From Swiss-Prot:
GO MF annotations in UniProt: lipoyl(octanoyl) transferase activity
Keyword entries, A-Z: Acyltransferase, Cytoplasm, Transferase
Group of enzyme by EC: transferase
GO cellular component labels: cytoplasm
InterPro entries (alphabetical): aa-tRNA-synth_II/BPL/LPL (IPR045864), BPL_LPL_catalytic (IPR004143), Octanoyltransferase (IPR000544), Octanoyltransferase_CS (IPR020605)
Localization (cell): Cytoplasm
Protein's UniProt name: Octanoyltransferase
PANTHER family the UniProt entry points to: LIPOYLTRANSFERASE 2, MITOCHONDRIAL-RELATED (PTHR10993:SF7), OCTANOYLTRANSFERASE (PTHR10993)
Gene encoding the protein: lipB
Length: 221
């Protein structure tokens, strides 16, 4: 988180271009600012719970999950929701490029937010999104389940939805009888769909044209 905060400050100060940082975390639950206590995992599971300042509720990170932190200057604070919808669309493109029919969903009035990416064939959630915006620069980002251990998802309430079934690229493709790509292959497809490549400082993303902006991949750790 400290490194992400440095990147955000650099983007605010104009010394860093829009950046997509791929990484993975050791097993950890992270909770957004509005996560109720009853959605947290029971004590004694051996998996830490980390408080964050992002939007969204509880999510789980682990090896085998592709996490992408997105530090983008979006031009205006009221562009956060359009940017989030654009990010969802690019992740849908990523999942479909892997051979899994996918979709984003609109949230009905009064419902828990359905932000993220869902599988159309099996009605499961495969990617989660949680963003924060500081002085027109986004932080945090998304998590795409590739081949991680899915059991810890059942030990808490993911995304505020007790009934949701989480899934992974591995599960969906294996169940359909297809080969499972490596993490490196998934990473390259995600980078392509998100428009991440080494580039000079870009303009703010053109939300009306569906452009996330020309980003730089900050590497993977």
């Amino acid at each position: 988180m400290a490194r992400m905060r440095v990147m955000v400050r650099e983007r605010i100060d104009g010394v860093r271009p829009d950046t997509l940082w791929f990484l993975s975390h050791p097993p950890v639950y992270t909770v957004g600012k509005r996560t109720p206590p009853e959605h947290r995992p029971l004590a004694g599971l051996g998996i830490p719970v980390h408080e964050t300042n992002r939007g969204g509720l509880l999510t789980y990170h682990a090896p085998g999950q592709l996490v992408g932190y997105v530090m983008c200057h979006i031009g205006a604070m009221n562009a956060v929701v359009p940017f989030l919808r654009l990010l969802e669309a690019r992740l849908v493109d990523t999942v479909e490029a892997l051979g899994i029919p996918a979709e984003r969903r609109d949230t009905p009035p009064g419902s828990v937010e359905l932000t993220g990416v869902w599988t159309r064939r099996t009605n499961r959630k495969i990617a989660s999104i949680g963003l924060r915006c500081t002085r027109k620069v986004t932080s945090h980002g998304f998590a795409l389940n590739v081949d991680c251990d899915m059991r810890p998802w059942t030990w808490a309430t993911p995304c505020g939805m007790p009934e949701v079934e989480m899934t992974s690229v591995q599960r969906e493709l294996t169940d359909a009888g297809h080969a499972v790509p490596s993490m490196a292959e998934v990473r390259e497809i995600a980078a392509e769909m998100l428009g991440a490549r080494n580039a000079p400082h870009p303009p703010a993303p053109n939300l009306s044209s569906g452009d996330l902006g020309t980003g730089t991949r900050a590497g993977r750790t």
